[in-house]
Amino acid sequence: MVDLESEVPPLPPRYRFRDLLLGDQGWQNDDRVQVEFYMNENTFKERLKLFFIKNQRSSLRIRLFNFSLKLLSCLLYIIRVLLEKPSQGSEWSHIFWVNRSLPLWGLQVSVALISLFETILLGYLSYKGNIWEQILRIPFILEIINAVPFIISIFWPTLRNLFVPVFLNCWLAKHALENMINDLHRAIQRTQSAMFNQVLILISTLLCLIFTCICGIQHLERIGKKLNLFDSLYFCIVTFSTVGFGDVTPETWSSKLFVVAMICVALVVLPIQFEQLAYLWMERQKSGGNYSRHRAQTEKHVVLCVSSLKIDLLMDFLNEFYAHPRLQDYYVVILCPTEMDVQVRRVLQIPMWSQRVIYLQGSALKDQDLLRAKMDNAEACFILSSRCEVDRTSSDHQTILRAWAVKDFAPNCPLYVQILKPENKFHIKFADHVVCEEEFKYAMLALNCICPATSTLITLLVHTSRGQEGQQSPEQWQKTYGRCSGNEVYHIVLEESTFFAEYEGKSFTYASFHAHKKFGVCLVGVRREDNKNILLNPGPRYIMNASDICFYINITKEENSAFKNQDQQRKSNVSRSFYHGPSRLPVHSIIASMGTVAIDLQDTSCRATSGPTLALPSEGGKELRRPSIAPVLEVADTSSIQTCDLLSDQSEDETTPDEETSSNLEYAKGYPPYSPYIGSSPTFCHLLQEKVPFCCLRLDKSCQHNYYEDAKAYGFKNKLIIVAAETAGNGLYNFIVPLRAYYRPKKELNPIVLLLDNPPDMHFLDAICWFPMVYYMVGSIDNLDDLLRCGVTFAANMVVVDKESTMSAEEDYMADAKTIVNVQTLFRLFSSLSIITELTHPANMRFMQFRAKDCYSLALSKLEKKERERGSNLAFMFRLPFAAGRVFSISMLDTLLYQSFVKDYMISITRLLLGLDTIPGSGFLCSMKITEDDLWIRTYARLYQKLCSSTGDVPIGIYRTESQKLTTSESQISISVEEWEDTKDVKDPGHHRSLHRNSTSSDQSDHPLLRRKSMQWARRLSRKGPKHSGKTAEKITQQRLNLYRRSERQELAELVKNRMKHLGLSTVGYDEMNDHQSTLSYILINPSPDTRLELNDVVYLIRPDPLSYLPNSEPSRKNSICNAAVQDSREETQL
């Protein structure tokens, strides 16, 4: 190839020397040509066109002048009519000739000359090759009719008094007005709605019709009654209003014919205008019009951007947003590209919402629509993804573009964004608050397996409630559960707080325990003034400062509370009692738990005699006396603080020699070396020394490293956690991480089996191959063989994740149909299996573990309807699967994003509780179970003290399970038996009252009576069906039903066993599904200090970071997997 540089010869030396001396001047005499652009605009015609048409401002001035000129001509016509003396006689000459003074004629001629010249000039400038198109236009014809006679009269004086219908210039004025409005919008760069233009055209058309009719009748009646302008106006108004009094009527046939013609014109023109106006009005109703600029500057509003608006999403947003008192005056502007559906339209017509919710149809990607919503003046913008889409990634991409568009248009508007896929989160890091659906969903489902009902706990915390749900119910558990559900997270500065001000300089655990003991509030976290990180239970080493921001759980925030001394409260409530059970609670405890604004300040010098105290052991039982509870120190002695569980040694696994020889894999602690997506928070975890080969991750396939083909062959010491999902998305990574976090005891790690419909990608396997005891298997919960191979018969929990391919359905709420039926099949086949299900729609949770003839479930359905009628945001909370944490819908967490508008810390606290974020010094959520050996503690307050003084843990709630000895078959007895029991109960009401006890009692013998009372209440709410006579018939019916149920269970058991034998699996340990006790589980968030502990209660704890107790904890936090010092690091970071 020829070198390009060699093709250009160098300059001679003299030119180079000249260039050195003269610089750029040496180029002045060269042959250069100056080129001028846009020469076509320099012609005379183009300059005129630029001035009269193209230039916005000059064109506006010309049209305004033209409009004024036409109005002036009409005004001169009126002046001529008023100055003219009525002529005598009825000759037709009066129609063609009028009396016009010379000055008036001169003015009209001048106006006509200017108008005609302007019309001809504009016609010339807009000429496009067809002269007839310009001549035959109606405005041009009217201009000729009104201007040419005056110009002719200049040269022919006898025509000066010729009648010219100058009043027709009103139509030219209307035409000029329309053009002027368009130019005005262009000049000020502001577009009015088409509705405004159409209304203006309609009004101007109506005025022109009336003015033309007035002037025409008045002129034609010059040969008749000689009406003046006022009489003509009166006649036109009466005629057009269809009243027609008949006192003023035209006499000549010409005027009558003119009236008929004008009425015909009106009947043609006005309906067309009204039709266009009605069409624009309907379109405006669909699109929503504009949000007023004046309102945007004087009132506060937020914008909700969604791709499609469903009624459930709308009501969740409105109920949660307007639940806060200070947001009552805010407007909500909804910006949605689709047309409003019928249900949404019906709701927005309710006066409560129509006054403060505005629906705009438009796209967030259009600046014009963002301007309509006044996004630059909005207090916040909520951007939600459409989760009911087959392609969720595409939905995320739309959300990302909306967020970018809003940030570009209004950079100062706070953004609250909901994203579906975690891999898309890093695109919107600039947003003020982001909730990633799959991150929260999988982390919550994972914690449900080790901390039961974590999903219910978080859902209740992020919903705004006053704790009034269930207070009308006759069942005590529903009252207590509903009352405690009103607890939320609030914040306050320590020095401004009555709750915590006295604990300045004290330890965190001391402040938390005494605040709960005194006020019933639970201090769970703190944040330094100069630090943005929130610390959950930083432990006893943390000393409270005056400027610290305290985060606490309570029924209401401190600012809305009033404080009364206990003596004053006792005097004002001598005859009042909040509770009439056997174990009466002190007033200060009940007020704190009931959620009233009056909170007792407990007087330590005057303690209620009925308050709970530890019973002293008898003299003969001193050898069995339990150790007393140590006091919580103001400044804790950290050398005495244990980093283990209260009741069992879970500190770290010192394995026995037998276990060491049987264990082939050594675990280390460190950060996972590979993350499946950008933006995942690093978490200190239990990891393997070396990653597992991909072939060994397959549970049901043997390889060269192991020969196991089913879960039973692995011989796991702990029960399995099975996750049934459609695909191994990146969000599934967040299910594994909380279960392998470093603070989980190694001995308690459960094997995780991923049952996937589709094989996982290689990058996902790269991420999970470092975690111990994580396997996958390709299969479906539709297939019994797949379930048996993955170890469902000895699994602790089965998590069924909602499938993306079924999230959208043509009929509302049918998206969960397949999931519900599959889970019901699992429930029938493996009744002892704990199944945790995710649904798309919360309304479908009523179908979980469905029993068609269960009266108690029917009664709960009635209760849910009543709570919804009372306006509760948590009407679904009394459904037994939700209360027990067996079912969850991610849409219930939408309120987390909405609540962040008022509580900007809620997302951070929720992420810390779920283990999605880990901050050095911040605690983590865990649980402990109350056994028989722990019942000596007796009350929640003493448990609080025991935990704070020994381990530094802070309890935040109780998961309570009550036994129900009514079997499934007994719940399906006939109505006649129920009514017979009703009659039996009525016969002995005194005995029934004497046996009634509180549901919080620890005596297990009370539960049958409680269940019997529940059945009575259920029968009252759902009584129906014919009566049967005789006790024998009822007993025979019940026996037949029990026999039918037993035979059905035996048939299912035989089916499962036969499949296991066919697959070569051992049937040992399979639950043959004998009658088992049904249970009722629910959560008590921040219960009162005097709540009695019961057997099998699970207490939610926020445990301090174990690494914060180590003197050299920072080096142990480094990733130490791929170096030789792993073992030393593991020893240093033991709990």
Curated annotation (Swiss-Prot):
Job description of the protein: Sodium-activated and chloride-activated potassium channel. Produces rapidly activating outward rectifier K(+) currents. Contributes to regulate neuronal excitability.
Reactions catalysed: K(+)(in) = K(+)(out)
PTM statement from Swiss-Prot or TrEMBL: Phosphorylated by protein kinase C. Phosphorylation of the C-terminal domain inhibits channel activity.
PROSITE patterns documented for this protein: RCK_N (PS51201)
Organism lineage string: Eukaryota, Metazoa, Chordata, Craniata, Vertebrata
Gene Ontology molecular function terms on file: chloride-activated potassium channel activity; intracellular sodium-activated potassium channel activity; potassium channel activity
UniProt entry keywords in alphabetical sequence: Cell membrane, Ion channel, Ion transport, Membrane, Phosphoprotein, Potassium, Potassium channel, Potassium transport, Transmembrane, Transmembrane helix, Transport
Domain notes: The consensus ATP binding site (1025-GPKHSGKT-1032) seems to be non-functional.
Name of protein: Potassium channel subfamily T member 2
Compositionally skewed regions (Basic residues) per UniProt: 1010-1030
Pfam family, one: Ion_trans_2
Residues in compartment: Cytoplasmic: 1-63, 123-137, 186-198, 278-1135
InterPro entries recorded: K_chnl_BK_asu, K_chnl_dom, K_chnl_Slo-like, NAD(P)-bd_dom_sf, RCK_N
Source organism per UniProt: Mus musculus
GO biological process: potassium ion export across plasma membrane; potassium ion transport
Gene deletion effect: Kcnt2-null mice are hypothermic and show increased basal heat detection and hyperalgesia to thermal nociception compared to controls during neuropathic and chronic inflammatory pain.
Activity regulation text: Are normally in a closed state unless activated by an increase in intracellular Na(+) and Cl(-). Inhibited upon stimulation of G-protein coupled receptors, such as CHRM1 and GRM1. There is conflicting data about the effect of ATP on KNCT2 channels activity. Intracellular ATP was initially report to inhibit the channel activity. However, others studies conclude that KNCT2 channels are not inhibited by intracellular ATP.
Intramembrane residue spans: 229-249
Record keyword Lipid biosynthesis present: no
Subcellular location: Cell membrane
Topology, Extracellular side: 85-101, 159-164, 220-228, 250-256
Keyword Membrane belongs to the record: yes
Domain RCK N-terminal residues, every copy: 299-435, 718-858
Membrane topology summary: Multi-pass membrane protein
